[in-house]
Amino acid sequence: MSAQINNIRPEFDREIVDIVDYVMNYEISSKVAYDTAHYCLLDTLGCGLEALEYPACKKLLGPIVPGTVVPNGVRVPGTQFQLDPVQAAFNIGAMIRWLDFNDTWLAAEWGHPSDNLGGILATADWLSRNAVASGKAPLTMKQVLTGMIKAHEIQGCIALENSFNRVGLDHVLLVKVASTAVVAEMLGLTREEILNAVSLAWVDGQSLRTYRHAPNTGTRKSWAAGDATSRAVRLALMAKTGEMGYPSALTAPVWGFYDVSFKGESFRFQRPYGSYVMENVLFKISFPAEFHSQTAVEAAMTLYEQMQAAGKTAADIEKVSIRTHEACIRIIDKKGPLNNPADRDHCIQYMVAIPLLFGRLTAADYEDNVAQDKRIDALREKINCFEDPVFTADYHDPEKRAIANAITLEFTDGTRFEEVVVEYPIGHARRRQDGIPKLVDKFKINLARQFPTRQQQRILEVSLDRARLEQMPVNEYLDLYVI
């Protein structure tokens, strides 16, 4: 005899309620969070502008139906597109993530919280243009910064103690959840409607990490976040119509997220939602490289300079040893053929070989015309990683959040260079004073890729003056980026 099904509808899961209460009620008071969000905004937009240099990215942009122009539609930076908020969120999100050069959060789960800007900026611009058209006040860029801080916090706090990669799920599911909550609040949904929206995000089938790992590594990893943040806008708009939610989306026996996708485990939390994640987020400033390799690339650049001074070249190298942390080995320690740029920018051997050979690492170095140089694979074969448990412990320590790598070079003549250790990359919170000027330089370089000098200056005059930027209507700011 089968057991009777309990059909009493439960209250919303506590985890969902906490997200919604945070986006609706928490006041961001941290100056550090707003300072960081300001530079994060500029860096994220700049990453999107650089991606427009790559045809593989550009071919995915624009309306679903070519030629479609949406009245009061979202302006996609660096283009002439005028799109609905769902497709605009995909466009902006894909641009941001394409080159793996935007911010990073490392914990039990990894991710790139500025991916959420796709949905946030698209929604804010769409709302602003429609408000102006009907004689109402538009949203300001301060509201965008607030949304960014909250989306960073939701994604990052869940990621602190909960590893989705361990069960084969991609971190973009957290982009979907965070963007849904923030966008729903931005759209003016009621508490019940935001609860519904967030539950809808959790009951979606979530993206697999298949496309991030050998032997299937591919370009979906560059547009997966755009897909997630655009899905968030769609779900929030559906909830706005009164579409129902699913209260025990996480905890329902058999059918909920925990039982279906998380091996029956519940989420663990290290801290309540505040502004911790934005304050401590990592920026990729010098190199477009998967973040676990950033300090290794920095060390390799130092070693390249030492080789130059000693009259040596990469051809003289016998062996390269990388002392690293466990996450680095699990994600990017890769041998064998590398099939495409997406494969190469997730291989620490490739990302160390390029600076040892050429004294640089740029996005262009992942392309086929560079990768065909046989010296790269020859050097990759000489590079080996091994875990240092201390580096792994420091990586997980919330007071340190180190991403340490150490490289030793041994040469064919029997000599060796002293090990070069880099614990914190220049984009780390501990190196903000060094990093921010370089981050601004990166933004300026990316503006110059797309805009004439006069337009660059107009963008910079507003963008570098935070007080002025915060007061500016979202639609007016994005108008500055139209080509």
From Swiss-Prot:
It is an enzyme of class 4 (lyase). The keyword Signal does not apply. Transmembrane segments: none annotated. This is 2-methylcitrate dehydratase. It comes from Escherichia coli O157:H7. One of its GO terms (molecular function) is 2-methylcitrate dehydratase activity. Its EC number is 4.2.1.79, 4.2.1.3. Disulfide bonds: none annotated. The gene is prpD.
